[in-house]
Amino acid sequence: MNRPDSASIHRGVTTLKFTKTDLSGNTGSAVRFSAAGAGANSGLSFSNPNFGDSGHTTAAAMAENYKEFDKSDTSPIIPEIRIRTFSFRVREIILAVVSVVALIGCLVLIAIVATNSKSDENTSSEMSRQKAIRTLCTEASCLKAASYGVSNMNASVNPCDNFHQYACGNYPTLNPLDPDVSQRTIFWNLYYDNEDKLRTLLEATASRTSSWSSEKKLKDFFMSCIDDYGKMKTGGKAFIDKIIQPLGGWDVLNNFNAANFNLQTNLQKTSIDFWTASLFTFRVTTDRYDRTRRVIEVDMSGMGMSWAYFIRDTTQQIRNDYKKFMRTVAQLLAADSGLNLDQNILANKIQTFVDDAFDIEFQLANITANTVPTGDPHNHEKRITLTDLTQQTNNVVDFVSFFQYMFGSSNVNGNTRVILMEDDWIRRMLAMVGSIPDADKARKLSNYIIWVLAHTYVQELSWTYIHANRVFWADVYQFEDFWGTWHHCFWHADHSMPDALGSLFAKQHFKDKNKEKAEEIVRYIKQALIDSVDSNKFMDDTTKQRAKAKLTASTDKMGYPDIYMNDADIDNIYQQININRSDYFQNLLNLNLFDKQDWTRRLTTGEDRSRWLYNSYDTTMTFYNSWNQLLVPAGMLQFPVYEWTLPHYYNFGSMGGLMGHYLVHAIDNWGGSYNENGVYGKWYTNASTENYKKVEQCFSVAYDNKTMGPYKVVGQSAPQSVLVNGRRFAWEGLAETSGIRIAYKAYKKWIADNGEEKPTPTPHYTNDQSFFLAFAQTNCFTRTDALSYYYAQVQRLPEDVRTNTALSLLDEFTQAFNCPAGSAMNSVKKCDTF
């Protein structure tokens, strides 16, 4: 049986394996995974599934970590920046920037006055009315919005021919791609702006220095991680002392006694104390049939690279490179142990180690190739007690003892039912382990477990180990650049202490007024959507009432949790963690214990809807139907997507359009599978379901006529274009068009309640036009042809196709820009929307 390949990233190295994607927004896998070995294209993720891949590469410079050895014994309070032979103080640079901004503002105003004086006769009646009753907005926020909008536009394009090009035509020029960057989008830029802010926060001296301060613990952990000098002094000694020795030694180091080896003990220590998945993995997740409860899932694991690489005829060189990597790590550990052993004997032991570990992974790959995931694994009839699982697999692993070691005997017993995500795989794996000849079993399993741990922790050791990992990636994937110490350590801080980091970000970079105005916008949009349900043409009365009930009951999480403003609350979260600035490896093990305690709490307390699924600095947004919540982290509530000082037509067009899109997902065919309490179950009537299908078909036809490309493709003489599969995108197309229409209606209601605002000093544009420009400019992008072609092949539509198609179906847009019937931006056939 053939399986697709997918990636799961271990703490220190990317490990490719097959896995079922968990779309329920749950906790994830059993090990705290790290993308440190993910090579050049890994970048860094702020949980950004909706707004594109980061695609950014940062090559680490070791020198940055040795700045403490700067020979200067003094430094000015206001530092200098040198550019070739000139030097400038930061104050001088700031003054220069302010002067330039002021000059630009003056020039914009002069241009507006000059332009308006020449074109009164061409200005629309709406603009004339606005000019007659008020002046232009010349506040700093309006100048900022006007400057940003005009700079990204290509005004030579007719907006009724290609509105995205009109709104974003100059964006690629202003945002050129570096050689190691495959794309830049609005959200990509926000993401890296946030990263820069977080870097500054992490590297700053802690303002609260008490032993219980979460800020101090976070920064001490981060500084211990970037201490390359300390890691070079320690080498692999920490791994040998704190992992190999507690497991009973290692055959390569000549201190292993097969008679004392206990698989049960080794698996428990590996999976729980060292938080590394070996023969299998597990996770605490939400029960799909009762979302108030948490359950334990048991899943496949145990391979250091894609299962396909182990067995395909075309991947022999990859297998050779992998074995070379294993051998190198073993040699480094042997050298750091101070072992005094005959070199021939040592070489034989290392070869045995490589053969043992590789053979078990090879057998796991064969099992993977010949099994399939369990269908509907959460079905109550497919769940199994821990006692039955142990007995039915010949007691190879005592699962009762294993999970009691993890969660405690008071929380788990033999009658605890677990979910096998890969039932056939788990049983075959345990049968394989049980069939290993007794003469070799202890040594072979020990060698395998030591390799799994070494592979996981190699990125946490000195540069010699990291370089071995890097060589493997260069051999296999031709990526010589590595993301370096800073990104690796940031990843750890982000995943290990996200609330401490999120609190610092929210307090430093987010104002309460930002949150208040965003909540005002979402209230207007939600009400506009509720009002629109009444006039909906494809829902019957029963479905309309259910839709309105769900929207009324829905809540939102905007910006950040309230506890982020209370230091004591954040300190309390991390009170059990001990962090030593000079002992990075022990810090990792202490964080493993913290994760163990956190998972136990989650299993025993069940669902907690007060939790935030995103960090405050994430750049994403979604409607989480299982909790009936709109999630908008503070990382999204920033310019150019949103800023509280901007006019409402700007914020409603940009942020409001996104909010409208995701609120529609609360009541479309997808949201129609979850009721107002988040319980799974269809609430659309049969008649409404059939009518909804007709609406989707209209959007399918609208997108079927679109083309992605053309793109220059390596190996192809002519540029390649890809047709849009409208059927696959129809439900998103409906949300896209409905979202911007709902945002527009909400904006009009806000005007009715609060009055018109002054327009920005942008020539010729009414507030309505600025609204649609703001929407379009959240979708500006530039991307390599290679990545664009890949996206096109998997039917990930580019922003220009999405934007133009969505707006062409809106009468409100075509009226705002007076697009004639039959023009590209005025679709002849309009579709029903929410």
Where are these regions (language model features)?
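Intrinsically disordered, low-complexity cytosolic terminal tails
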Residues: 1-74
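Helix-loop boundary elements of multi-pass alpha-helical membrane proteins
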Residues: 64-104, 321
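Alpha-helical transmembrane segments in eukaryotic/viral proteins
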Residues: 93-134
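Intrinsically disordered, low-complexity linker/terminal regions across diverse proteins
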Residues: 116, 347, 357, 363, ...
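Short, Gly/Pro- and small/polar-rich lid/capping loops
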Residues: 128-151
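Active-site-surrounding "flap" and adjacent substrate/cofactor-binding loops of secreted or lumenal enzymes
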Residues: 137, 141-142, 158-161, 166-237
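Hydrophobic/aromatic-rich, well-ordered segments within soluble, folded domains that form packed cores
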Residues: 152-174, 309-332, 730, 740-742
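Noncatalytic, helix-rich "gating/capping" subdomain that lines the substrate-entry/channel surface
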Residues: 197-524, 561-564, 578-584, 588-594
